[in-house]
Design a protein with these regions (language model features):
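A structural motif
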Residues: 1-72
Length: 72
């Protein structure tokens, strides 16, 4: 597996993204890694989110540029 750049809720074309789970609505979630205040933070991404949601400092931060975990 490897981290691949993504942005704005779009998945990298031609890549198999590792699924991380589902929202209660059934929307797929993917493993994300992004930066909040200079710190790399794991979180979730989904096409329906328009970015990645990253928990940090007791809050959930939304970032537009992040990485998603993909199969090689």
């Amino acid at each position: 597996m490897e981290w691949v750049p993504a942005r704005d809720g779009k998945l990298p074309e031609g890549r198999r993204v590792v699924e991380g789970g589902y929202e209660s609505s059934g929307a797929k979630l993917y493993h994300a890694l992004g930066v909040v205040n200079g710190v790399k933070v794991p979180g979730k991404a989904g096409e329906h989110l328009g970015g990645a949601n990253l928990p940090f400092g007791g809050q959930e931060h939304v970032v537009r540029e992040y990485e998603v975990l993909c199969w090689r």
